[in-house]
C-alpha cells in the first residue's frame, strides 16, 4: 500500500515542505525563526479575528469597544494583550531572522531574499494600522504624523495624504479604512510567506558554514520538527510572561487617553519596533530627505546580494565582517534608544551619527572588509 502523504495531491505538498524535506544536518537554532514567524502570524490572525468580533471601527466607539473587550468579554483582556504583545514577539523574530540572513549570507538566494524584504514592509504597514485602531492619543497622533510624511512627495503629496485620510484630517473614514486594511493584510503576508517558502524549497536551506550541504542532508521530520517545537514553546513562554506579568511594558501610557485632536502629546513616538527607522527619519532636517532615508533604511536590504564582495558566503570564517556585523547590531540598538528620546541635545547629534554609521556600515565598510578578507586569504 502506498503512503497517502506521498500520493495525495494536497498532502504531498505538506510532505515535501515539512516532513520529507531534505535539510542540512548542521543548521543551528538561528534557523528556528522562520517557523516561529509562521506561529506568530497564525497567533495574530486568530487573536485578531476574535478581537474583530467585538471591535467597532468608529471614532465615537472605538476606544470604548477596546475597553469593553478588556473588561466585559470573557478572557478579552488576554486576547487583546496577546495580540498587542504578539506583534512585539513577531518583530523580535523578524529582526532575528533578517539578522541571521545577513550573517550567514542567505541573501544569495535572491528570489527568497527579495520576497523576504517585501515581508517586513507589509508587516510594518499592518502593525502601524493596527496601532491606530484603539483610537487613543498615540494612535491618533501617530497616524497623523506618519501619514503626513507622504505630503513630502513632490507635486502629488498633499492630494495623496488627503486621499489616504479620506478627508482633510485623520477621522472616521481613516479609522474605517485602516481597520479594513489591517484585517486583510495578514492574509497577504501569509500568501507572501508561502511564496517565500516556495522559492526557498527550490534551492534548499543555507547552513552556518555557507558551503553546499548536498552531501549531508537529513529529513526535516522528526529532527527539526522537534527542534522547532522547542523554539515555539520558548516563544509562547516569553509571550505569556509578557502578557500575564507586564502587558503594558512595551505600550505607551498616552494610548490610555482617548484621542483628542485639540491636544498634542508631548512626545509622539511609535511602538519600539519602529524606533530605529523613526530615529533615522528625525535625524535628517529635510522632510523629503527624512522620508527617503526612512524607506531606504529597510529597502537597502534589497542591495545585499549586490554588495556581497566576499569569496565566502557566510561570516562564520570572516572575523572582520563579524566585528562590523555586531557594530551594526549595536548601532541599530542605539537608533532604537534615540527614537524614543525627545528631540534635544545630545540626542540629536547621537541620532545623526548613528544614522550615518548605519548606511556607512552597510554600503561601504562591510563590502570593504570582505575585499580585505579576500586578499588575506591569498597569504
Swiss-Prot record:
| Major subcellular site | mitochondrion
User: What does the UniProt entry say about where the protein is found?
Assistant: Mitochondrion inner membrane
Arranged from A to Z, the UniProt key words for this protein are: Electron transport, Heme, Iron, Membrane, Metal-binding, Mitochondrion, Mitochondrion inner membrane, Respiratory chain, Transmembrane, Transmembrane helix, Transport, Ubiquinone
Membrane topology (UniProt): Multi-pass membrane protein
GO MF term set: metal ion binding; ubiquinol-cytochrome-c reductase activity
One Pfam family hit:
Cytochrom_B_C
- Show the PROSITE patterns listed in the entry: CYTB_CTER (PS51003), CYTB_NTER (PS51002)
Gene Ontology cellular-component terms for this entry are: mitochondrial inner membrane; respiratory chain complex III
Residue positions annotated to bind heme b b566 are 97, 196
- SUPFAM superfamilies membership: a domain/subunit of cytochrome bc1 complex (Ubiquinol-cytochrome c reductase) (SSF81648), Transmembrane di-heme cytochromes (SSF81342)
Cofactor binding note of this UniProt entry: Binds 2 heme b groups non-covalently.
Detail which positions bind heme b b562. 83, 182
**What InterPro entries is this protein classified in?**
Cyt_b/b6_C, Cyt_b/b6_C_sf, Cyt_b/b6_N, Cytb/b6-like_sf, Cytochrome_b, Cytochrome_b_C_euk/bac, Cytochrome_b_N_euk/bac, Di-haem_cyt_TM
Q: Name one GO biological process term.
A: mitochondrial electron transport, ubiquinol to cytochrome c
Q: Provide the residue positions that the database annotates as binding a ubiquinone.
A: 201
Listed cofactors: heme b
Q: What else is known?
A: Heme 1 (or BL or b562) is low-potential and absorbs at about 562 nm, and heme 2 (or BH or b566) is high-potential and absorbs at about 566 nm.
Q: Enumerate the PANTHER family for this protein.
A: CYTOCHROME B (PTHR19271:SF16)
Question: Which purpose does this protein serve, as stated in its record?
Answer: Component of the ubiquinol-cytochrome c reductase complex (complex III or cytochrome b-c1 complex) that is part of the mitochondrial respiratory chain. The b-c1 complex mediates electron transfer from ubiquinol to cytochrome c. Contributes to the generation of a proton gradient across the mitochondrial membrane that is then used for ATP synthesis.
* Quaternary structure note: The cytochrome bc1 complex contains 11 subunits: 3 respiratory subunits (MT-CYB, CYC1 and UQCRFS1), 2 core proteins (UQCRC1 and UQCRC2) and 6 low-molecular weight proteins (UQCRH/QCR6, UQCRB/QCR7, UQCRQ/QCR8, UQCR10/QCR9, UQCR11/QCR10 and a cleavage product of UQCRFS1). This cytochrome bc1 complex then forms a dimer.
Q: Which family does it belong to?
A: Belongs to the cytochrome b family.
Protein's UniProt name: Cytochrome b
Q: What is the lineage of its organism?
A: Eukaryota, Metazoa, Chordata, Craniata, Vertebrata
